[in-house]
Amino acid sequence: MSRVHVAILGASGLVSQRMQQRLAMHPWFELVAVAGQSQGTNLADIEWHLDEPRPEVLDSSEIKILDINDRNLAEELKNRNVIAVFSALPSEPASRIEANLVSAGLHVFSNASAFRMHPEVSLVVADVNPEALHASSGQALHACATNCTLVPILHPLSVLSQHYTISKVVARSEQALSGAGWKLLHNQELKMQAIDQEIPGEAEKIVEEIERILDLSAEWDVQTKRVEERDGHIVHVELHVDNTPTFDMVASLLQSKKQTHALPSQPTCLMECIQSEPSREEHLWNGQSMNPLNPTVDLKAGMTTTVQLKSVENGVVSFIGLSHNTIRGAAGGVVLLAELAYLKKYFEQ
């Protein structure tokens, strides 16, 4: 079976390179084009920022970077038989470029925030609200993944909100440096300025995106901060519920969350519940199905959310969630979204 030709918007950022890593050997998708600022440069010559080596197939690739600002970009992509585009662009260029590609008939799956709250654009976490994936009449599909910090909150919350009325959500995040891009990882001055500081606009994004996905109306108390860790977002959460569940009742519900679709990036265990506090060193790559770690081949690695249920007392459910921010919370979530669209036969329409 021939693979679907796909392209990536963005070439050198961490999310773009996670996308490149995940698409290099993907069973359903074939990466044939990348658009960015370094037009004309061979993709293999772009500096690689991930800890894992660049996939060999990309090292030998003859892909040249297309001009991201070319008004004929859609035609350039169509000339390469591209059907789907993965966007790793910042919000401002995404707001200009993504809609043009959709209008030209290309399906766009975006990690950018620009269209997440647009009423005609799908905001989807593939294993939480797959039914929300839709295209406007006569249009190609335009779908967005969420803010990377949502995942360790959303997976437990999506399960519990089906059984309990949530009146208040209190969340405190500890977000890794990679969530702000590779420059923060390598610039000591920027790093010191960011650590332990509130992340502007982050809490507001978390609230509005969760409310849209779950149709949830609750009181919110959310604070976010950057911590001196390379990867992995940890969130401490308290849910105030209008019921009196027991610890065992909540634990049973969290453990009942199962795989929803048989997709290449979908881990067998969507949410691993553990008794100890989640650790980046031990649990960051949960979902991993082969050793040694090779996320180019093992698309499930880093896709499982890790949760410790701390307590259930007086109608307050306390838990800690951990997810890999550049994989599950970004590139992996976007690719999973495209896999869902493939399964739903959008690419055949």
Regions found by a protein language model. Give the residues of each.
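NAD(P)-dependent Rossmann-like dehydrogenase/reductase catalytic/cofactor-binding core
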Residues: 299-349
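C-terminal substrate-binding/catalytic lobe of Rossmann-fold NAD(P)-dependent oxidoreductases
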Residues: 5, 14, 18, 25-78, ...
